[in-house]
């Protein structure tokens, strides 16, 4: 594995996005109590990942760029004291383009961040307005420029496609903007209508209409073709990176590395159990204050571990080694996998090279269906 991984959920946003179903809070008065609680949670859960030093740190959202240098300094000091951060290879800050002012980006030079992941979502004004984002096209372009001027080359952006009314041409222009900016890593996600979001309510009321499935497929294949032609490697279903710029942090999720998540609704995994924190900020603060973090725990049996291994492995260009299946889960599971995979191999939806199964270019389009057939039920 990659050593251990640490993820911080910073649950604050200045404004809630239309499609968002992540936990976040727009009230900054909780910021200080939250940082105190997060440091206390690290102390309480120090043993969870078994004391190995951290390999990557990821500040996720909400919007961590709502925190200031002094806030980050407190958190880094605690993480180093409790887990050891000197061997960290990648430290990522998730940021909104409109938070990336010249002063803010300059202040990051005093902190150990070496990667920025920016929630651009689109370079089109109408998309940004529809998604209820705070930034505009100009701010997104400027934010990327500021990072580069301040020596941060390792930049990732998120893009969303499949918006109501989106055309193929608009999506191509978005991708061309990203390529032209020489952004070395791009994560692209299809818009999802999650129950409970403002977007879902608009769909229910008939005010927005999801795009046709044929167009979704065309947008996805355009994404793959455009970025591959431009020199990006399609290393995970939603992720594209230039060589040397894959996200080590995300790769650790897909390779079964232990990780600890700190903060409301953060998830953790140590090979034997999955844990996730309560999403309510007041309840989270209360639990930490009492010295009893409010955590749900799922102990993982061998079948769940096998299913996790299949889902995470097949999402990547590295795929699944059948020898690993035999070694980790026994011969019965290996035989089952080979039987279940046979049809897809014949149809050219899975590829087998040496000992490794990967999705073919065609297979990527129906990956969910293929994966569910390979699972142990």
Give names to the regions the model predicted.
Residues 1-6:
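Short, small-residue-biased leader/transition segments that mark boundaries at the very start
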Residues 11-22:
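Local cysteine-cluster metal-coordination motifs and their immediate loop/turn environment
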Residues 24-47, 52-331:
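C-terminal scaffold of the Radical SAM
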Residues 331-343:
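Short amphipathic alpha-helical interaction segments
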Residues 346-355:
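A short, conserved structural fragment
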Residues 356-360:
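Minor-groove-contacting beta-hairpin "wing" of winged helix-turn-helix DNA-binding domains
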Residues 364-377:
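Short, amphipathic alpha-helical interaction segments positioned at domain boundaries
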